[in-house]
Regions:
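Accessory cap/linker subdomain of secreted extracellular hydrolases
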Residues: 60-61, 69, 132-231
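Conserved alpha/beta-hydrolase "acid-adjacent" motif
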Residues: 245-250
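Glycine-rich nucleophile elbow surrounding the catalytic serine of serine-hydrolase chemistry
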Residues: 122-132
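N-terminal cap/lid segment of alpha/beta-hydrolase-fold proteins
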Residues: 2-36, 400, 404-406
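Cap/lid segment of the alpha/beta-hydrolase catalytic domain
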Residues: 35-110, 158-159, 437-438, 498
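Short beta-strand/loop motif that positions the catalytic acidic residue
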Residues: 232, 238-240
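Alpha/beta-hydrolase fold nucleophile elbow
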Residues: 112-124
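C-terminal, loop-rich substrate-recognition/catalytic regions characterized by aromatic stacking residues
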Residues: 278-643, 648-664
Length: 664
């Protein structure tokens, strides 16, 4: 261990090596309770590729010292090929990554300061890695916490939805190489620069693989615990936010494993809940401490006396780019499937009603729906919430209820069954559920998308579906939403959702024949929390960092230029200074979308992500730009990468790829 810092209740070690069986060493930062060498303690670790030395250092300072102050060893590990760790990362969630997590568990149990009881937690990638480690988990892994994690990499991750390609995947394709291409710190070796150059020489470009795997095949099944939920061993605390699509795993896992999983879903986006946007937030540190104290401190822990589900039931808010506090309230329930019944609404020419009927209505043939989607379908960035849906609704075929006579509470995953005719196998449907206020303002509750080339399991059918009548089933993401009396529930259906979803090769003719929307509603009025969730604390009390800027996302106004419709957004430069290591870390991202009206093969999206590291020994800048275009049968992918040190270029990469496009 090196660079030790000691305060009254714990010691921290800036850089520790963890040996893997193949000789690669993973880098860790450790916070050790002061008495752990004389009284071994349980250990909890977070395992991610996001650079322990700087990138998420401020976040780590909120969580890990708090655990050590309360008698639990806290460990932050950089994944293989990232940060200060050795080795290479070829892709997300590869077998090597999962094996390494198990080796970290084994290493922790062998340390003199550990009593053999291990917990694992994380957000996003770290939460998903925790779920994966829990499949046939080693006995030492006693519990996990998965925040904003996915249990279904194909349907509920950043890449695809309903068998359609999300442009979020392209953004992540520009971001990940920048993260992996950033330099290790001088903590590791005197020859860190040579190690960096060797890593840059073999830098991976995983977006190519993501585009090549269009359906739910073995590639996306790997690491998706939804297919292995019966094999999970340790108790799971699932945490999500309704402004973040990764929340879908919470209700699903509690439904699948009510014996093993507990869930909390609030109104926030892709954040730990103590930094909630929108709020209200939750004191995550106290929450996880209570979880770890039950499963790791008690000798023979019995069933945890928590409600199975604690959810923020949203209600109407006037749409805005950013909302500080959502309208709604906390409730506690058993697993959602245990307390709900299904209410059916049939699609008719008069809207949504209780009687089945034939409709025979064509969907609008345009690319106008989607411009009011939000900056992204997933992260719920501060400043990027979906605006008023009225413009998108006018470009869609809408089915409305009459103004509701009483509140309607949707609790769980709604479903839609449709009979339709389509002129092309590769058409797509976008489906939105909206809350329409008496003044006509339309708020998106949730949405789903469906690629008609794939079957209901989002697999490639043995033979293409006939172009006659087609029956499909679509499940919406889970939700907890109260539509107030006097408001209208709207189902809006369109053929595209650009720029959030990549457009099909052509806009064909889709005729809806019949349809039924099924909503899960509780049997009874849901119970308010008996015990309030912990309040947010401003941690750590003494900060070793200063956030210089944390700007709100800026949307580019849509404009028509040179025959194209152009839109986009910009995440302004945000930076933080870490005084302990005398380092500035900053980043910025921009996105641009272009398309000619009703010409699907002119679609183009471009993302650029840049990161800056200003250290005592020099300044590194890494930038990755990705552009995606298409023709009928190919994705045309262009990527560029540049890394520099003190204004001198260290390495560049250029990728120019044509990727077969069969189904999306």
């Amino acid at each position: 261990m090196n660079k030790e810092k000691e305060i009254e209740s714990f010691r921290s070690f800036e850089h520790v090596w963890i040996d893997m069986p193949d000789g690669v060493r993973l880098a860790a930062r450790i916070w050790l309770p002061s008495n752990a060498l004389t009284k071994p303690a349980p250990a909890v670790f977070e395992y991610i590729p996001y650079r322990k030395v700087d990138m998420v250092r401020a976040r780590d300072e909120r969580n890990h010292p708090y655990l050590a102050e309360n008698g639990i060893v806290a460990v932050r590990v950089d994944m293989r090929g990232s940060g200060d760790s050795e080795g290479l990362m070829s892709d997300m969630y590869c077998e090597e990554e999962i094996d390494d997590a198990r080796q970290v568990i084994k290493w922790l149990t062998c340390q003199p300061w550990c009593n053999g009881k291990i917990g694992m937690f994380g957000i996003s990638w770290g939460g998903t890695a925790s779920l994966q480690a829990n499949v046939n988990a080693p006995d030492a892994l006693k519990a996990i916490i998965a925040v904003c994690a996915t249990h279904d990499r194909y349907e509920d991750d950043i890449h695809h939805m309903g068998g359609c390609l999300l442009t979020d995947s392209v953004e992540w394709g520009a971001t990940l190489p920048a993260i992996l291409g950033a330099p290790p710190s001088a903590n590791i070796e005197e020859n860190w620069f040579e190690i960096w150059k060797a890593r840059l020489d073999k830098l991976s470009f995983p977006l190519e693989t993501w585009l090549r795997n269009e359906d739910r095949g073995s590639y996306w099944r790997h690491g998706s615990v939804i297919h292995q939920s019966d094999e999970m061993r340790a108790p799971i605390l699932c945490v999500g936010g309704w402004s973040d699509r990764y929340s879908n795993s919470v209700m699903s896992l509690v439904d699948r494993r009510p014996d093993l999983a507990w869930g909390i879903v609030g109104p926030w986006g892709h954040h730990y809940p103590d930094h909630a946007h929108p709020g209200p937030g939750v004191g995550f540190q106290k929450l996880m401490l209570e979880w770890w104290q039950h499963w790791l401190i008690k000798d023979n822990p019995l069933e945890l006396e928590w409600p199975k589900l604690r959810t923020w039931v949203r209600s109407y808010d006037s749409p805005a780019d950013a909302i500080n506090i959502r309208s709604g309230s906390w409730v506690q329930t058993p697993a959602s499937k245990e307390i709900t019944f299904m209410t059916k609404w049939h699609l008719s020419k008069g809207g949504l009603n209780k009687d089945a009927s034939e409709i025979h209505l064509n969907l609008p043939s345009n690319l106008k729906a989607g411009t009011k989607g939000a900056d992204t379908g997933y992260f719920g960035r501060f400043g990027g919430l979906p605006p008023d849906q009225s413009n998108d609704d006018r470009a869609s075929l809408c089915f409305d209820t009459k103004p509701l006579e009483k509140d309607c509470l949707i609790y769980g995953a709604a479903r839609l069954e449709l009979s339709l005719k389509s002129s092309d196998h590769r058409n797509q449907l976008c489906l939105r559920l909206n809350d329409v206020a008496p003044d006509g303002t339309s708020v998106r509750i949730t949405w789903a998308i469906r690629n008609l080339a794939l079957d209901d399991n989002l697999e490639t059918p043995d033979q293409p579906f006939p172009l006659g009548d087609l029956k499909i089933r679509v499940q919406f993401p889970s939700m907890a939403y109260r539509i107030k009396a006097g408001h209208i529930l709207r189902l809006a259906v369109s053929q595209s959702y650009w720029p959030m979803v990549w457009v099909p090769p052509s806009i064909g003719v889709i005729t809806l024949l019949r349809g039924v929307l099924t909503l899960p509603e509780p049997h009874y009025e849901l119970e308010s929390l008996k015990v309030n969730l912990p309040k947010v604390e401003d941690l750590p009390l003494e900060k070793s960092y200063t956030v210089s800027t944390e700007a709100q996302l800026e949307r580019y106004p849509e404009k028509f230029e040179n025959g194209e419709i152009r839109s986009g957004w910009y995440q302004p430069y945000s930076s933080v200074y870490f005084n302990e290591i005398d380092t500035y870390f900053g980043y910025e991202t921009c996105a641009e979308f272009r398309i000619r009206p009703n010409e699907t093969l002119t679609a183009c999206c471009c993302y650029e992500h840049s990161m800056t590291f200003i250290r005592p020994d020099g300044t590194a800048v890494v930038t990755c730009m990705v552009q995606l275009k298409c023709n009928n049968d190919k994705y045309l992918l262009l990527g560029t990468f540049k890394a520099s040190w003190d204004n001198q270029i260290v390495k560049t990469h250029k990728w120019n790829l044509n990727i077969t496009r069969k189904y999306t």
